């Protein structure tokens, strides 16, 4: 039978659910956590003290309905070289994001529930963990939708980076733009930049 120490080697982070899936009771799990002084990385998420903390994965575990977007996606897709100061996520309207934004490390955007999964993909972060993030075209739509809160030079740099990419999909971009009701604005920017 596998123990918590082996789970830590395999997963880097452990939760009571992971332990239960491997036949370890909650009692044994929390006993191991207390005896070995595991560090609490988030609500119900533990790691050994010598591991670096994967903040993106922890945020994903804290709010599984949210998708990394905006600044986080710009940086991941190499549309900007500026690493985000705060993590940006998108979730559905009505989600209580107070716990995510309370520490000032996150900014949460909201959309209609049926639009949350538009353009959602699973990517590997710097630690090799899978996290949800929007694809290039959804990221550009998010940029244009929130253009009033983005600095002009950042806005222009991200759009120019997208236009210069070989893997851009303008048809998908226009499809998403119609869903988010920004197709006229997107068309205007694309006509100028292309």
Regions found by a protein language model. Give the residues of each.
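Short amphipathic alpha-helical interface segments
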Residues: 1-12
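A short, conserved structural fragment
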Residues: 37-42
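Residue-level marker of alpha-helix boundaries and capping positions
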Residues: 6, 19-20
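Short amphipathic alpha-helical interaction segments
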Residues: 22-34
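Nucleic-acid-binding surface
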Residues: 13-18, 45-194
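Short alpha-helix boundary/capping motifs
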Residues: 9, 22-23, 64
């Amino acid at each position: 039978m596998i123990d918590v120490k082996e789970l830590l080697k395999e997963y880097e982070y452990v939760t009571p659910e992971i332990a239960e899936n491997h036949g370890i009771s909650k009692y044994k799990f929390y006993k191991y956590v207390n005896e070995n002084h595991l560090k609490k990385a988030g609500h119900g998420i533990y790691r050994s003290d010598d591991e670096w903390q994967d903040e993106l994965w922890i945020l994903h575990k804290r709010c599984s309905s949210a998708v990394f977007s905006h600044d986080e996606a710009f940086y991941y897709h190499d549309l900007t070289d500026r690493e985000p100061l705060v993590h940006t996520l998108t979730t559905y309207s009505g989600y209580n994001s107070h716990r995510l934004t309370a520490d000032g490390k996150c900014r949460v955007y909201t959309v209609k529930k049926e639009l949350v999964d538009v353009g959602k993909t699973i990517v590997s972060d710097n630690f090799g963990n899978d996290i949800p993030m929007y694809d290039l075209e959804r990221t550009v739509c998010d940029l244009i939708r929130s253009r009033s809160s983005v600095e002009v030079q950042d806005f222009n740099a991200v759009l120019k980076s997208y236009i210069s990419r070989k893997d851009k999909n303008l048809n998908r971009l226009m499809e998403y733009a119609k869903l988010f009701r920004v197709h006229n604005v997107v068309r205007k920017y694309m006509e100028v930049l292309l």
